[in-house]
Amino acid sequence: MLYIVGTPIGNLEDITYRAVDVLKSVNVIFAEDTRVTIKLLSRYKINKKMISCNAVTENKKIRLLLDYLAKGDSVAFVSDAGTPGLSDPGSLLVAAAFREGYKVCPIPGVSSFNTIVSVNPFRDKSVLFEGFLPNKGLKRFKKIAELYKRGDAFVLLESGHRLLKLLVEISSVSLDAKILIGREMTKIYEEYQIGKPLELKKYFESSKEKVKGEFTILVSRSSS
């Protein structure tokens, strides 16, 4: 059995009892970064063999995963934060397990997407998850314009050092876009701000501390 386990996005208390039980019961844990996952395992007194499996190495770890499953071992996969499958490795492992006829079981948990949507103040009928945009170039701007033109709200992930650039890019598409920004969600310095692109740019550029951390951005065209 391959378990795909949702883990916290910041606060280590944000994990289900079921997820903890699964991590305690499996034979081995494939982790995006073992240095990150060891903190979670230590918090819940879980001592298991871990194997690093990230976006670069995932394809090479498929054979190892299948070897474990062939022996009848149970395996869990966890990303650094949140529920695997969105902007994280894991899909290649899942595809291989399905292809070879092994059972795959999702263990739901928190994600940046459902966290930001839960505090969305705009009345959007649908919300798309885009995740990380291309780092630079015309492709990045075109993607923002394409997403905005569709009319659905959409969610982006961005690092602090590119946040101001992103807000300028969104303003180039629409000065009136409605934006909800979650900074360091569930962590010590968690905060949420709403406004139009240039209003938010002014707020976040007012202090270097404000652009530190990880950002989740919901962009809306809602009229309400």
Curated annotation (Swiss-Prot):
Its EC number is 2.1.1.198. Keywords: Cytoplasm, Methyltransferase, rRNA processing, S-adenosyl-L-methionine, Transferase. GO terms for molecular function: rRNA (cytosine-2'-O-)-methyltransferase activity. It catalyses: cytidine(1402) in 16S rRNA + S-adenosyl-L-methionine = 2'-O-methylcytidine(1402) in 16S rRNA + S-adenosyl-L-homocysteine + H(+). The keyword Cytoplasm applies. Its main location: cytoplasm. GO terms for cellular component: cytoplasm. It is found in: Cytoplasm. Pfam families: TP_methylase (PF00590). The keyword rRNA processing applies. InterPro entries: 4pyrrol_Mease (IPR000878), 4pyrrol_Methylase_sf (IPR035996), 4pyrrole_Mease_sub1 (IPR014777), 4pyrrole_Mease_sub2 (IPR014776), rRNA_ssu_MeTfrase_I (IPR008189), SAM_MeTrfase_RsmI_CS (IPR018063). Catalyzes the 2'-O-methylation of the ribose of cytidine 1402 (C1402) in 16S rRNA. This is Ribosomal RNA small subunit methyltransferase I. It comes from Borrelia garinii subsp. bavariensis (strain ATCC BAA-2496 / DSM 23469 / PBi) (Borreliella bavariensis).
